[in-house]
């Protein structure tokens, strides 16, 4: 399975120069497998769970990549929070799209997702079998890479209790521990400074990217008080981005 989805991604990139309007940028291209085993101390029952999590899909020649979906060939779905929490003595303490995880482009990649597994009362064994923690999904035709994946133990704790996990590991958890599973964003298609400013504004207002990212990577300057595009400042910022890109 892991090999198949990565080969698909590699083939798409290889075919892209000859089929530019039919190929998407890179996706998460992995199963993103999260599993845990836990013994409920109240009744002695043993529980185990396995999930394959979604991530950002690559952008295409005419549209953005979908946010937090399963990629080509995976044929799985995310388990609903209510289902997981009703069957296992744990909590999904956070489930969200990851802001600024898209691969910037004329059409942006889809956002990755964050799912935090919290074990309030019982020790547990957690398994990460995943990838993309070194390099995020690549963009094409001037598009940029999506944010890479992160796997973090106790993400909201002090530095002493927080640690970054590798993409392939088994970790023993104590009561109160949390594992944050953060999948990558999809790659972008085309230069970011060619993106429609209205689309950038929509992403900012929708909480998918922040104002600074809009300015620095897309060259779109948005007034933070009115949430309107500053056209003169945007024209200047985009000219500077194009000049910088051409000089490199």
Where is each model-derived feature located?
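Glycine/proline-enriched, intrinsically flexible loops and inter-domain linkers
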Residues: 1-248
